[in-house]
UniProtKB/Swiss-Prot annotation:
The phosphorylation status of Ser-84 appears to be involved in dynactin-dependent target binding. Residues 1-188 are annotated as: Disordered. Belongs to the dynein intermediate chain family. Residues 82-91 have a biased composition (Low complexity). SUPFAM superfamilies: WD40 repeat-like. This is Cytoplasmic dynein 1 intermediate chain 2. Homodimer. The cytoplasmic dynein 1 complex consists of two catalytic heavy chains (HCs) and a number of non-catalytic subunits presented by intermediate chains (ICs), light intermediate chains (LICs) and light chains (LCs); the composition seems to vary in respect to the IC, LIC and LC composition. The heavy chain homodimer serves as a scaffold for the probable homodimeric assembly of the respective non-catalytic subunits. The ICs and LICs bind directly to the HC dimer and the LCs assemble on the IC dimer. Interacts with DYNLT3. Interacts with DYNLT1. Pfam families: Dynein_IC2 (PF11540), WD40 (PF00400). It comes from Mus musculus. Residues 1-13, 20-43, 164-188 have a biased composition (Basic and acidic residues). InterPro entries: DYNC1I1/DYNC1I2, Dynein_IC, WD40/YVTN_repeat-like_dom_sf, WD40_repeat_dom_sf, WD40_rpt. Keywords: Acetylation, Cytoplasm, Cytoskeleton, Dynein, Microtubule, Motor protein, Phosphoprotein, Repeat, Transport, WD repeat.
Amino acid sequence: MSDKSDLKAELERKKQRLAQIREEKKRKEEERKKKETDQKKEAAVSVQEESDLEKKRREAEALLQSMGLTTDSPIVPPPMSPSSKSVSTPSEAGSQDSGDGAVGSRRGPIKLGMAKITQVDFPPREIVTYTKETQTPVTAQPKEDEEEEDDVATPKPPVEPEEEKTLKKDEENDSKAPPHELTEEEKQQILHSEEFLSFFDHSTRIVERALSEQINIFFDYSGRDLEDKEGEIQAGAKLSLNRQFFDERWSKHRVVSCLDWSSQYPELLVASYNNNEEAPHEPDGVALVWNMKYKKTTPEYVFHCQSAVMSATFAKFHPNLVVGGTYSGQIVLWDNRSNKRTPVQRTPLSAAAHTHPVYCVNVVGTQNAHNLISISTDGKICSWSLDMLSHPQDSMELVHKQSKAVAVTSMSFPVGDVNNFVVGSEEGSVYTACRHGSKAGISEMFEGHQGPITGIHCHAAVGAVDFSHLFVTSSFDWTVKLWTTKNNKPLYSFEDNSDYVYDVMWSPTHPALFACVDGMGRLDLWNLNNDTEVPTASISVEGNPALNRVRWTHSGREIAVGDSEGQIVIYDVGEQIAVPRNDEWARFGRTLAEINANRADAEEEAATRIPA
């Protein structure tokens, strides 16, 4: 072991010695290179100095010659050693003089003399400059100005004509050469690519908005034309036409079956449509999303499915989703983020879900806990999660007192309530029901209509007084009735219509205002604080088509109606009608008290007449 360690130590010492030798050699090499570079620099500097001295000498000679002074070559005696000077003899001096004379004869005679030096100073040339400004008419020098302008204008480079010629030649060649023609396969590949479809859909929507925008550039902010518009302002107190939505392909020959405004984007309106019997090859069910913000005449989104869409709604808390209930019983879900027009989700056609037409779909709950509620005409109510439509979370059949199931045609939830709701049926009866609890299912029955219920809606305006127990219904019996959940008899019957009343809805902001539409194409607004016998405002749609659906905007300032010919009409509601005053809730309370008193008197009179 000791021998190996000694050997290793010896190797280490040799390695260190070799490293020292290499470093010493490297250091010497660097010093040698440094010396060489220094010498080169010194030589270059000396050459430069010599050249500078020679230049200065030539300049001095030239200056003297210009002054008339001749320069003689200086006599440079031969170098003599000190020893030769000290040991020189006369003979040697003579011989040296003769030798010098010979040299002098070669270089020219030497003339010595005295001269007076005249010093001459040449002052530099004085340049006097000054500026002077005067005001003079410029008409006296038109030619000079033109010349100056010509001088200032930069002439075109001579290369430009050649460039133009080459450009023209290139253009001619390009025009003569036919462009590369894409094959049909390449065209179809581009047209069906995901990037092109996304770009085309997005770009056409923007271009449509820009082309359809109309701005009144003659608007007068001074108010001078207010007198001319006084009649229009008075008419605006009632109803005025705002927009009409109709698509030649997707709306024609279809019936508007449902309307709903988006809560996230108030300008968006979804409308569902029945099948088009004139076009059997088109999809049976269609849902169109219309935009009120832009003046475009085409729908923002087009969705369709295989079965007629009987109901549609924007999925609350999910602004990209649209829910539809179909005639086949399926619940379909469309997503506007997808490039497909067909549903991204749908419920199965099985006994676990709906097998009859779904006329009612509604999203209830809060941001963190909400469900989709659907009811079909076989009386089955289902609760769904929007994330999974493969099977319902909960289902129940609405049956009244062990009789047959209730054929539901309409449904409404009170404001802020997710458990209790009211439904209208094909038999003409109205029912209250609840989803959960010991009394889940049908609670009470309300009788009063003589025909199927077409529309039902709970009181929606929130204010100082709670009127959530009120609801209105419309029916085929040409009437609209006012109800309260506290009494199974109608509070009041509005009988001003002369045709089927297809839909009814409370104003979302005014406590005493509701709207209804009938089969004669008439839209009525009822303000119960003003009158209960005749509507406050009425308007008929052009052509008098049957109006199937009515829907207020969330602001209560516009109202949409859909007809049997596929057209949607938007009306502006006058401020005097739409905007409630502060005392409207108290006035409506007094109106209800009067209605209750009149109903009690009528019941007493009827009771006294029966025995007689």
